[in-house]
């Protein structure tokens, strides 16, 4: 059974995918997500924070992700880009969520919504990004 937090990440990823493709306002996407299957079982507070936070901070998040990529962020598939934005937002703003959990959840999102090997790429990018954004936490984990 999926956790409420996982459902909120799935819905945020779907909403951000739509936002990346259509450029629709966040409020419009939010309204559509409220009618989506699984919304009633999602962590609404986390969904709102992630969806609106990523849209608000998308330039800064993309700038943080860019050095970890092997190509311009615009060349990523919209699914990979949405997943990376969700994870980057959580890494930067939700320090209560361990970085390994953020990476694992992003890998699961990439497996669910992305191409065959997209999850491997997401994992590699987030490994680099977490080392930058959560240097102390990642170094402590690697010393164990």
Curated annotation (Swiss-Prot):
Xref: Gene3D superfamilies: NusB-like
GO biological process, one term: transcription antitermination
Keywords on record: RNA-binding, Transcription, Transcription antitermination, Transcription regulation
Disulfide bridge map: none
UniProt key word Transcription: yes
InterPro entries per the UniProt record, alphabetical: NusB-like_sf (IPR035926), NusB_fam (IPR011605), NusB_RsmB_TIM44 (IPR006027)
An annotated GO cellular component: cytosol
GO molecular function, one term: RNA binding
UniProt function note: Involved in transcription antitermination. Required for transcription of ribosomal RNA (rRNA) genes. Binds specifically to the boxA antiterminator sequence of the ribosomal RNA (rrn) operons.
PANTHER family reported for this sequence: ANTITERMINATION NUSB DOMAIN-CONTAINING PROTEIN (PTHR11078:SF3), N UTILIZATION SUBSTANCE PROTEIN B-RELATED (PTHR11078)
Family: Belongs to the NusB family.
NCBIfam families linked to this entry: nusB
Protein name: Transcription antitermination protein NusB
Annotated gene: nusB
